Amino acid sequence: MTFDAADSPTALPLAQVTPDRFDAGEATPAAVLSGEVPASQAAHPLSIFDMFRIGIGPSSSHTVGPMRAGLAFTGELASLLAGDEGDEAASTPQRSPEEGAESKAPCRIMIDLFGSLGATGRGHNTDRAVLLGLAGYSPESVEIDTVEGIFPTIAATGFLPTPCGQVPFDIARDIRFVPRTVLKYHVNALTITAWREADGHEKILEHTYYSVGGGFVMVQTNDDVDNPQVASLATGMSAATIDAPAPFLFTTSARLLHECKQSGLRISELVRRNEEAVRTAQEVDEYLDAIADTMFECVDAGTSASGILPGGLDVPRRAKALSTKLSERARTGCESLPGAPWASSPDDPMRAMDWVNLFALAVNEENAAGHRIVTAPTNGAAGVIPAVLGYLVSYCPEAGATIGAASAPALFDSPEAPLARVRFGSKGVEVLSDASDIRGEAWARRRKAVHDFLLAATAVGSLIKTNASIAGAEVGCQGEVGSAAAMAAAGLAEALGGTPEQVENAAEIAMEHSLGLTCDPIAGLVQIPCIERNAIAAVKAINAARMALWSDGRHTVSLDAVIETMRQTGNDMLSKYKETSAGGLAVNVVEC
C-alpha cells in the first residue's frame, strides 16, 4: 500500500526518540532520527505520480482533494444504484453527466464542510470543487469553462447533473459550512450524504472524507467519531503503486543517503529505479514530460493574462506586465522602461532573480484564478518548483561549468553561450536571445536535467509528507511553501550535479529557514500573502542549493531533524495560523 502520513504512528518529540521505544515491526518515521529502520520494515516511498498531480486551483487540500472526494462518492453511488437495478452500465463515474439515468438519481445530496474546509471553503472554492466531483469530473481533465459554469448551471436549473442523473439541488440549502466543528482525524473534513427521499428518509450512501494536503484524500471506514478508522483514497495513476514492490525503501533522509551510498546511485537515479519497478521507462519519462509541460504552460498562461483575480480582494495580476518589461529590457536594455535603469539589463548580475519572481507570480496567479496547475506539492505552493525549473533551464549552466564542488551537466552546446532569457510555452522554453540554441542535443540534456530535478524533488517531498505534513491546515505555510522550497532546492542541486549529501543539505537549508511560516490568507483566498511568498521561496531555494553545492555535504542539522522540527512547530502553532483566516494578516489587513 502506498505510504501516507496518516498511516504512520504518531511521531514523538526529538527528546523521546530512542530505538527501544518502538516495536520491532513498526517503521515510525521519527524513530530513525536516532537509528536506521531496516529496509524490510520501511514504508513504500511516494511516487512522482503521487507528489506531482495535474489539477485546478486554488488549493490542493481545499479544492483538488474535495473534488476527488466528490468524484469517488459519485462513482460509488452510481455502482450502488446500478446494483439495485441490475444495470452495470451505470457504474462508470467518468462518463458525461448528461448520460445519467434519471430514474436512478437520488432525490437529495447534502454536503457538510467541517473545520478549515468550512472556515475558508468559499475562498478556496471548496463547494464548487465538490459539486464538480459529484458531477463526474476529475481535477486532471475538467475544462475551465465547466469549472466556471457549474454554479450557474445549478442556479438556472435547480439540478446537479451527476452520472446517476439529475439530482434536485439547492446550493444554499444543501451545502453547509461548519467551521466550528473539527472532526477528530483531520481539520479538513467533509461528509457527503445521498438520500432516496427529499425529506431525508432512506439514506442511500454517506461517507466522510479527509483532505490531508497535496490532493491526498482519506475516507473514513467506520462510524466511530471518537476513533475514526481511515483508508487512502487511491485515484488515477497513483493507484498503480499500491502494494507494488520498490527496490529502495526509505522513510528518512538517513536511510535514503544510506541506500545511495550502498548502491552508488544518485538520488534521482534511485527514485527512477523505484518508479521503473512498476512502470516502463517510457511511462515515467512521459509523465515527467507532462508535469514539466503543464508547469511551462501555466507560466505561459500567467504571463499572457491580465485583469483582476476573482474573490473580491481586487488583486491585480502582475505577471503579464512584468514579463513585458523584462522581455523589453532583456532585448534592448532600454533605460526609459519602468524600474531602476540597471535592473535586468545585460549588466545586472541579479537579473535572474527578476525572472524567477516572474515565473512564480505567473503560476500562482493562474492558481488563484482556479486554472490548471501542477500540485507541487500543494496548489498554494505551486509556483516555487516551476520558478526554480525556470532558473535551471534559463540560467544554469554553460557547458563545462562548475558550481562549488559539484560538476554540472552540460546544458548548452557552446561553452561561450551566455545566460539565456526565456519565456515558457507549451513546447518548453522560447529563448529571447539569438545567442543560444537549446534545440537538438542540448534540449535532450536539458530534458534529462529537468527529469532529474523532479525525481530528486519527489524524494524530498515523500520524506516531508511521510514524517510531517504538507498541509497548511495542519502545520501552517511551512508545510506548503517550506516543503516546496526544500523540494526545489534538492531538485536544483541534483540537476546541477550535486552529491546525495549536497542534495540533502540543500533541502535542509531551505526547510530550516522556512520554519514557523504561518498560513493566514486574507479572506481565505490563495492570493495574499501566497502569491508573493512563492516568489520569495523560489529565490530561497536557489540560494539554498547554491550554498549546499559549495559545501562537501557535511552539516550540523539533518533533513530528518528539520522535518521533525517542522512537525512539532506545526503541532504547537495556534489553529488561527493554520488556514482558518482567523489570525495574522487575515485579521490585520482590511479586505477591500
Model segments located where?
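Functionally critical mobile loop/hinge segments
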Residues: 113, 485, 490-592
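Accessory "access/gating" subregions that flank catalytic or transport cores
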Residues: 281-403, 431, 438-476, 584-592
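Alpha-helical support elements that line or immediately flank enzyme active sites
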Residues: 61-78, 386-398, 443, 489-497
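Flexible, glycine/charged-enriched surface loops at secondary-structure junctions
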Residues: 82-88, 100-106, 144, 285, ...
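Intrinsically disordered, low-complexity terminal tails and inter-domain linkers enriched
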Residues: 6-38, 82-102, 399-444
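Beta-strand segments within the central parallel beta-sheet cores of soluble alpha/beta enzyme folds
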Residues: 83-87, 100-115, 402-404, 410-413, ...
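Conserved phosphate/anionic-ligand binding catalytic regions in large, soluble enzymes, centered on
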Residues: 52-72, 370-388, 475-486
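C-terminal regulatory domains involved in ligand/effector binding and gene-expression control
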Residues: 138-342, 353-355
